[in-house]
């Protein structure tokens, strides 16, 4: 008797790219499940909203996003929280490429990524910015679905961020998370936290904005901020997702001196 064939699951593929020159959309590409939305905004920087129409990512999926800002100011985000589901095969992969031209500003503030139990995910974020450009970059992770009482016991996450500034390497971060990182007795891991965020500002006046940011850091979320060499970084850890989201929102508004993207307020 022949062995039953292993079913082949449909995999998500998507590519989306947008390029702005000032307030004008210069180039746009989208294919597969990756889409680009350009909301109509008035009196503020143009916003680019990336969307995964598959509703989430799982093993074997591949999404590629790119946003290029030649000059002026642009805000990039995601339409909603992204979900990374249990994988029954290879790792899912999300790649994001950002470029910021001379004197340009990019606020890259996607909404949170929610990790389900059994997730296997690899994310790679690469930024190339001019020496006098400005970057605000936010990354937020929520570990499990609190409303369902989910506790992550099996997960594999590899998260990499790399920034070059004026052609020189300015920042590299590589994060790996596994089941052992969620033990409440592990201060080297997340020490019991289920939501974490990292906010980075790369700007010539980054050090000058540190005190104003520290002034809005909350007391109900573990957080700290520091600045050096044209870079400001704030870290957040929280036992629940909502206090973290609220804290991050205030920090982003303070650092960018502006309102959050409109989709954050839905």
Swiss-Prot record:
Subcellular localization, per the record? Cytoplasm
The cross-references to InterPro entries, in alphabetical order and at most eight, read: UreD
**What GO cellular component is one of the record's annotations?**
cytoplasm
Pfam families reported in the protein's UniProt record:
UreD
Q: Which UniProt keywords apply?
A: Chaperone, Cytoplasm, Nickel insertion
State if Nucleus is listed as a keyword. no
Transmembrane feature ranges: none
Q: Which GO terms describe its molecular function?
A: nickel cation binding
Kindly state the subunit structure of this protein.
UreD, UreF and UreG form a complex that acts as a GTP-hydrolysis-dependent molecular chaperone, activating the urease apoprotein by helping to assemble the nickel containing metallocenter of UreC. The UreE protein probably delivers the nickel.
Which HAMAP family does the entry link to?
Answer: UreD
> What's this protein's function?
Required for maturation of urease via the functional incorporation of the urease nickel metallocenter.
Family stated for the protein in its record: Belongs to the UreD family.
Kindly provide the name given to this protein in its UniProt entry: Urease accessory protein UreD
Gene name tied to this protein: ureD
